[in-house]
Amino acid sequence: GKVVSASMSEVTNGWVALVIKAADKKLVCVTQGECPLTAMWAVENSCEQDGLHVDIMSLNANNAAVIRRFVKWAAPSACGTKGTSIGFSDWLGAAGGCIAPLFAKKQVKPVLAEYSAADSVLLKRNFLEAVDAATWGVFETGYKEGYGANAEGLKSEEDIVKALLYGYSMIGLDLSLIHI
């Protein structure tokens, strides 16, 4: 396969990157010595070669969470007070990899993961799938300037906790059921 060089990132005692072979994308981690990530990956295949440990993995929710934790630029971040943020209503999660590079060196930050509780039922898509799609898109392009993740229309404490646990940088509450 071909290594997506923009995704190559240093981790403790090794490197992680996306590899594309035909239409299939895999995550590959190459380490030497002890690496805390090895125990966290959901590994499909692994081998040892010349003192190097190689893990080959699918792009799943578990591995996206590990990437967000150890490759900080691939995780959503707060938009802050500098510049502007723009959302794209990319409810299908297909545009993150295409849109992010357009914002390189700009004072505008893209909101790449957008989750709406109402739309999720129609799309059959949950919190995690939305942020994972943005994570993999950003990781593949190597976009390191930050992006936002928005979860809106949240009605329950459970949904708020999930959004925060999954790394959403902005949440919107639906207070229509609150009685004063």
What are these regions (language model features)?
Residues G1-R68:
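N-terminal accessory interaction module
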Residues G51-W73, V111, A117-L128:
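Conserved oxyanion/phosphate-binding beta-strand-loop segments in alpha/beta enzyme cores
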Residues A64-I67, D90-A94, P101:
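Low-complexity, highly charged intrinsically disordered N-terminal segments
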Residues I178-I180:
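Conserved small/polar residues in nucleotide/adenosyl-binding loops
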